[in-house]
Amino acid sequence: IQWGLKVDQTTNATSTADAVNTLWAITGNVDNPGGNIIIRNAFGQNLSYGYGYHLLSPEMQSKKLGAEFPLLSRAGYSSSAHADSVLAAIETGKPYPIRMVWMTSTNPIANMGADAPRLYRALKKVDFVVVNDLFMTPTAVAFADLVLPAAMSPERDSQRCWWVPNRTMVKVTQHEECVGDDVLALMVGKRLHPENFPWKDGIDWIESIWKNETDGTIPYTNFDEAKKQVWAYPPFEYYKYAKGLLRPDGQPGFNTPTGRIELWNSQFSLWGYDPLPHFKEPSCSPVSAPELYKKYPLVLTTGARSYEFFHSEHRQPGNISRELHPDPLFELSPAAAEERGLQEGDWCWIENQRGRCRQRLHINPSLDDRVARAEHGWWFPEEDGAEPTLFGVF
């Protein structure tokens, strides 16, 4: 069973994933040939977001916003603060004010902010904002006190170890003063806490990870060797749970409190979550918000992808992506379009309780009559970037 963002980013994401895992378990399709494979991170490298979290004192760690949401914050998977809690702290100043925001390669008012007007109002309150990006985006223009140009992949010596394989990226060019975000983090770290950033450059940092923070099976420990090999796969094995390869103590079993596959999730129970898969109605659905549904009688989805773009990237004029897909599109079924007197290609306003945007209609016969499917991530670099236009993002 494969799943993607349709499962990952919904109200019921965790519970749905739990249900799918249960199906794997009761049918015996776990880490076996033809079944669902349990993938380990390449050569034992740490996959958690936020490198260096262990260097913070317990007092500083306790101040992380969103600790009351333990699934990510206490599971060791992410050291990041809870995004909604950060937004609330900016708005209210509680439990403490957020005075500075640093954003790297993100364009939230065009893309990841589900409530862009709210996010716009909040980020305007922050004392100092740094944006590190490839392009001057609506987010950079709207909020940044300082814009730092980011290096593209061909301008970076780096590695990628998100699961497998381990991949080496080799720098082949340099444009002006652009640097990679890892090098930028090292530069800032050396000024703030040099004792925690002893490496002389980004390559030295990577080599230190290979030497000191892997399981000892990685086939290289210096960058020159890695450049020649380009990528490296760790040895692959089925039935890792039977060989002690899933638990930090090296014992057979799964990385759960009981060591078994748990249909009744004991860790969820400990954290105060329902230990069994369950359904929760979305907060703005026709069932949970009937009065809102009377005003806005279509269910709007915004997660659909277009093959030409990745989130808010590649919108520049002259780019082949914009030539193939020049305008933002939304979809209705033939019946829903006819009911509203709309035809293919019409420009329409799409509105809900959070705001509105304008996109062109594409009629999709496969779509449910109760649903409108809109694209996300749109902005128009060819338009004026200054306030209030902000490249047409609003």
Which stretches of residues belong to each language-model region?
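Aromatic-residue-lined binding/catalytic grooves and analogous aromatic/hydrophobic interfacial grooves
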Residues: 2
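Active-site rim elements
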Residues: 7-10, 171-178
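Stable alpha-helical elements in mature extracytoplasmic
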Residues: 10, 19, 181-184
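Extended redox/cofactor-interaction regions of prokaryotic respiratory oxidoreductases
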Residues: 22-142, 151-158, 170, 234-340
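Short, well-ordered loop/turn and helix-capping segments at boundaries between secondary-structure elements
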Residues: 25-32, 125-128, 146-153, 190-197, ...
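Glycine/threonine-rich phosphate-binding loop and adjacent beta-strand/alpha-helix elements that clamp
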Residues: 154-174, 189
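Long, contiguous, secondary-structure-rich segments that constitute the structural scaffold
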Residues: 182-229, 316-331, 335-394
